[in-house]
Design a protein with these regions (language model features):
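DNA-recognition alpha helix
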Residues: 55-73
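Short helix C-cap/helix-to-loop transition motifs enriched in small/turn-promoting residues
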Residues: 69, 93-97, 106
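Major-groove recognition helix of helix-turn-helix-like DNA-binding domains
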Residues: 72-93
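Juxtamembrane/interface motifs at transmembrane-helix termini
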Residues: 78, 105-107
């Protein structure tokens, strides 16, 4: 008889079950449940993800192939498609959402490094659109004959771990997702050109956080003062004020504008930031990383 643990059981043995049980109790996940517990549901979904299952039917078939080993694999009793579907539909999703963020925090602590030598964390924020079949996901209508959702992700650059997710309709403009980012005091947030929303950028500044964003080419501004001695590849390092009517209303204070020449890509980048104590090269490296 095989006495060692299966690989899947070894993988999930690192999961903090005590904290998961705390969340289950907090949200009443196992209330009136006799067989298919939240823990069984979690392991079933993890198995489906790791084995690239494409549907609930595919997942339950894959699990029931190993029915005699289900105890050692920690799935519990016989897993059916209907039980799994009901659990996914009826149980409080906050159990799994909170536990996912708990695992992310654990992973970040174990991978903590100090690449930038800064006091705060460094994040980048961007979105990706996932196409969906309208016949199946009718609620995700994006265009006339196309469905989709957007996943907005906050990514910790130093640990290389995503720390926050926000899912919206594909129609939602990227800048709207800036409103739900859990900003941290003293941390740095790096954005691409599509996030040039000065009202939202000013909010970051008022929260005592820092941002670095690529500037649009049609930016209207005037220089207040600038540095004369510039390091290699820094074309300009200036303090500016926005002169456009609405941009100035939304961001009434001065900004820092850094122009950088990237030798690898053979092109120029222009950044806006409220981080005035960092060097110009540090600003460029925050975006480049």
């Amino acid at each position: 008889m095989y006495k060692d643990k299966y690989v899947f059981a070894l993988l999930v043995s690192f999961i903090d079950r005590n904290h998961f049980n705390y969340l289950v109790s907090k949200y009443g996940g196992d209330k009136y449940v006799k067989f298919f517990s939240c823990w069984n549901q979690l392991l079933t979904l993890i198995f489906g993800q790791l084995s690239n299952r494409e549907s609930l039917r595919d997942l339950t078939v894959g699990i029931n192939v190993h029915q005699k080993k289900s105890y050692h694999l920690r799935f519990g009793k016989h897993v059916t498609k209907s039980n799994l579907a009901k659990a996914n539909q009826n149980r409080d999703n906050r159990i799994f959402e909170d536990f996912a963020y708990f695992l992310v925090d654990e992973a970040r602590r174990k991978r903590a490094v100090d690449i930038f030598k800064l006091d705060g964390n460094v994040y980048t924020f961007d979105s990706t659109t996932i196409d969906l079949c309208l016949d199946v996901f009718w609620w995700a209508k994006f265009r006339k004959h196309k469905g989709g959702i957007k996943i907005h992700t906050l990514y910790d650059i130093e640990t290389q771990i995503p720390t926050f997710f926000h899912i919206t309709s594909a129609k939602v403009n990227d800048v709207n997702a800036m409103d739900v980012i859990p900003y941290e005091i003293g941390s740095y947030y790096v954005f691409d050109r599509g996030y040039n929303d000065f009202k939202r950028l000013y909010r970051i500044k008022t929260l005592d956080s820092f941002f670095v964003v690529r500037s649009k080419k049609n930016l209207q501004y005037k220089c207040v003062k600038w540095s004369r001695r510039l390091p290699q590849n820094i074309l300009s390092d200036a303090e500016i004020e926005l002169t456009g009517y609405y941009p100035h209303q939304y961001y009434p204070e001065s900004l820092r504008l850094v122009q950088y020449w990237d030798e690898e890509l053979n092109r120029e980048f222009t950044y806006l930031t409220n981080a005035k104590r960092l060097s110009a090269l540090q600003i460029a490296n925050l975006y480049k990383k």
